[in-house]
Amino acid sequence: MLTYETWEENDVSFSEEDETKGALSVLSWAYKEYENEIVYACSFGVEGMVLLHLINQVNPSAKVVFLDTNVHFQETYELIQKVRERFPSLNIIEKQPKLTLNEQAKLHGDKLWESNPNLCCKIRKILPLEESLANEKAWISGLRREQSETRKHTKFINQDHRFQSIKVCPLIHWTWKEVWRYVYKHSLPYNPLHDVGYPSIGCEKCTLPVGEGGDSRDGRWAGKVKTECGLHYQ
């Protein structure tokens, strides 16, 4: 088994020539390699809808974790229910932070997402994902190279130093148009905020619509020197 510790033995390669640009092959390999020791960390963005559909074909009982920060858009919570109905056999886990919003405010002040967004992300996303990955050998992410400068070198299989794990990214070669084409072709549910200028949807407090010509991460933590929550630093 390929693990963080045995990374030097990595000789895995995949063809990008099929209709999913290698995504199904990558997922098939991942679930064969890690069996029940892999989880998909899903934010329920539009890429997530594609991956959930593909994962359901490969492993209908796969584990899916959603990092419920308690400050997501209502539309996101409604979408999760639709996904549960569409893919009832998937094991969707809504992971909560240890601190409630009130407890966080008492310790760090109100509106931590404004005063210290990095700490807020650590408490409400990074630490919960660390806990979710503690007993896993690998995790799946919907990163695409086209999304931003910070993601353009992502590979199918990555040694993830942040979580000391293997990060599997099946959609790296997909374009934004291809993602939507797949969603429409398979009549997949998606967050209606995508239709009103939100290409990337995170917490309600830190996500704004993106103007024409911006990249998909421009609406995240707008006005701050920050485009990632910290989950995807290598």
Swiss-Prot record:
UniProt-listed InterPro entries: APS_reductase, PAPS/APS_Rdtase, PAPS_reduct_dom, Rossmann-like_a/b/a_fold
Molecular-function GO term, any one: metal ion binding
Enzyme Commission code(s) on record: 1.8.4.10
Cofactor: [4Fe-4S] cluster
Keyword Iron-sulfur attached: yes
Gene that encodes it: cysH
Compartments (UniProt record): Cytoplasm
Cytoplasm in keyword set: yes
GO biological process, one term: cysteine biosynthetic process
Pathway: Sulfur metabolism; hydrogen sulfide biosynthesis; sulfite from sulfate
Binding site for [4Fe-4S] cluster: 120-121, 203, 206
An example Gene Ontology CC term for this record: cytoplasm
Name of this protein: Adenosine 5'-phosphosulfate reductase
Reaction(s) catalysed by this chain's protein: [thioredoxin]-disulfide + sulfite + AMP + 2 H(+) = adenosine 5'-phosphosulfate + [thioredoxin]-dithiol
Keyword terms: Cytoplasm, Iron, Iron-sulfur, Metal-binding, Oxidoreductase
Cofactor note: Binds 1 [4Fe-4S] cluster per subunit.
Active site: 229
Annotated Gene3D superfamilies: HUPs
Function according to Swiss-Prot or TrEMBL: Catalyzes the formation of sulfite from adenosine 5'-phosphosulfate (APS) using thioredoxin as an electron donor.
Protein family membership: Belongs to the PAPS reductase family. CysH subfamily.
Signal peptide: none
